[in-house]
């Protein structure tokens, strides 16, 4: 290890991590999980990568993943010729992320049959599920433009409001993007999937403000009223991003041999940042990130359309403004202080969220006094949170915090232990309208499959790396 591995956990979350390590050593984990080594070992392996600075960090929702554990944050010195970029440090769903849209509606406005009607309208308008085709027409020329320009393309085409990009991380566009570095196969997959939600843990939820912790910050975000209706969208770059990652991993195998990069886990395949392979992956990954922002923008367009259909009102009359949009899987060039010296770093965040503090130049003007909004999606049927970044987080975690609850059971374990009918019935009993393309897959996303999101949030709060603003409760869930 070149640097320490630091894990942010409380006692209960630590027990889960240690149990995972114990089970693996004893050979008792299910065959479905055998491709991934325990998260604790993964965090330690990342700490041995060339060019890493300060520490390999793991957020409270950490669990095992491909190469990097999910919840891992790692930064690499751009001025170090040995420093690397790793697709495993970003993930296959590049710029999987979350956005929150507020409204001026209240829970009373969406009671009873209206709630079901809204859920049905969202399900009808937003394509969901594995391999589903897009609801937004897209030519190859359109695709190249949006891969380069991000949300600006959606604004030009009428799928986003001009103001939306101001409330997106990076203003909804990575300037390091180059569509020419995205393979034909990746583009082919992306052409049919613009404006689609996908499956797995992706969702569109109607939520209501359940609790306000920071009145000032909530008011500035426009979500300060208990019972206020919001919409949360969670999805990413779909098949295009997956193909970009797959392509890069194949290329980097050869680059590692050429440059004599020695790894303790093959899933950490990487390339020197300054190498041709490293530069081209960064450019392709950035383009895939732009696709994800446009995808969430298009789904926002479809969600606004669905609400207008049900309430027979224009979406701006319902104050359907974007609160913020954050990435959960990304690598970005950022400025940070390390050992008292400002450095240009390539920060990998995999299953973690940027959380910049007040007065940071890269967050919107209207949030300068409170810090960057941080959107934390819960599990299906459980609460979500809005946080803000802190100065302590900027100093200790490269301005990063958690991204969700984090899996406690593998997908295979969930399918074995849980019954999908019971999961669906429990949601209905809790007053949550549910529309799902593949009912049998809901067990994989049941609350029992995940850690307690409240424990995760509270751990971040106590550590001081982010602060709670609002808790949101779901009243309708749309899934693949």
Curated annotation (Swiss-Prot):
Its cofactor is Mn(2+). Its EC number is 6.5.1.8. It is an enzyme of class 6 (ligase). GMP binds at residues 201-205, 328-329, 377-380, 384, 403-406, 479. Ligation probably proceeds through 3 nucleotidyl transfer steps, with 2',3'-cyclic phosphate termini being hydrolyzed to 3'-P termini in a step that precedes 3'-P activation with GMP. In the first nucleotidyl transfer step, RTCB reacts with GTP to form a covalent RTCB-histidine-GMP intermediate with release of PPi; in the second step, the GMP moiety is transferred to the RNA 3'-P; in the third step, the 5'-OH from the opposite RNA strand attacks the activated 3'-P to form a 3',5'-phosphodiester bond and release GMP. HAMAP family: RtcB_euk. This is RNA-splicing ligase RtcB homolog.
